[in-house]
Design a protein with these regions (language model features):
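Bilobed "Venus flytrap"/periplasmic-binding protein-like clamshell domains
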Residues: 23-50, 114-165
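Short helices/loops that flank or line small-molecule/ion binding pockets
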Residues: 42, 65-76, 152
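C-terminal motif of bacterial Sec signal peptides marking the signal peptidase cleavage site
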Residues: 15-18
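Positively charged n-region of N-terminal signal peptides that target proteins for export
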Residues: 1-9
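Short helix-initiation/N-cap motifs at beta->coil->alpha
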Residues: 34, 58-69, 160-165
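Beta->alpha turn/N-cap motifs
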Residues: 62-64, 74-75, 80-94, 143
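A structural signal for short loop-to-beta-strand junctions that line the ligand-binding cleft
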Residues: 97-111, 116
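A generic structural motif
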Residues: 52-56
Length: 165
């Protein structure tokens, strides 16, 4: 997995370098500090810094939904975005129905497949998603892909973020 991530980071760096006319700074949406998106963005920045042909400024954001919004508003030049979030934003679907379709961006490379896990304490009385009703649940930072995916999962079970604490 680490070799694949390193290869994808190198590929993205090459692609970003080919987009720059030199001298300009690429604003790169990196999500929250400490996460894999932030680590990947900073690795891309390090490779570009070592090469010296491209200046990348990583921007800490809430995550995928914020990144796609900031790309469409031209605040970011590049970002890491979950593919399902990019799809929904482009088509104005699911969590983007109210805001409508967002555009002004395109996919460059797939980095990795993401899984969503629901994890509880071993001694918990939670055995299914239905058991989350009335419980304290972390659904992720606002405008993150985690938040949007959590809301989709809860909705599929007839729950919403107001039904959990």
């Amino acid at each position: 997995m680490k070799k694949l991530l390193a290869l994808l980071i190198a590929l993205m760096t090459v692609l970003l370098c080919s987009c720059s006319s030199g001298g300009e700074t690429i604003r790169f949406g990196a999500a929250g500090t400490g996460g894999i998106y932030n680590e990947a963005a900073n690795s891309i920045k390090s490779i570009a810094d070592a090469d010296g042909t491209l200046k990348i400024e990583t921007k800490t954001t809430a995550g995928s939904a914020a990144n796609v919004r900031l790309l469409s508003q031209n605040y970011l030049d590049a970002a890491i975005v979950q593919s399902d979030i990019a799809h929904d934003a482009f088509n104005g679907e699911n969590n983007f129905e109210k805001s409508g379709s967002l555009d002004g961006y395109s996919a460059v490379a797939g980095m990795f497949t993401e899984a969503c896990h629901i994890v509880v304490k071993k001694d918990s009385d939670i055995n299914s998603v239905d058991d989350l009703l009335g419980k304290t649940v972390s659904i992720g930072e606002e405008e993150s892909g985690s938040e949007l995916n959590a809301k989709q999962i809860l909705s599929a079970y007839g729950l919403n973020s107001k039904m959990v604490k």
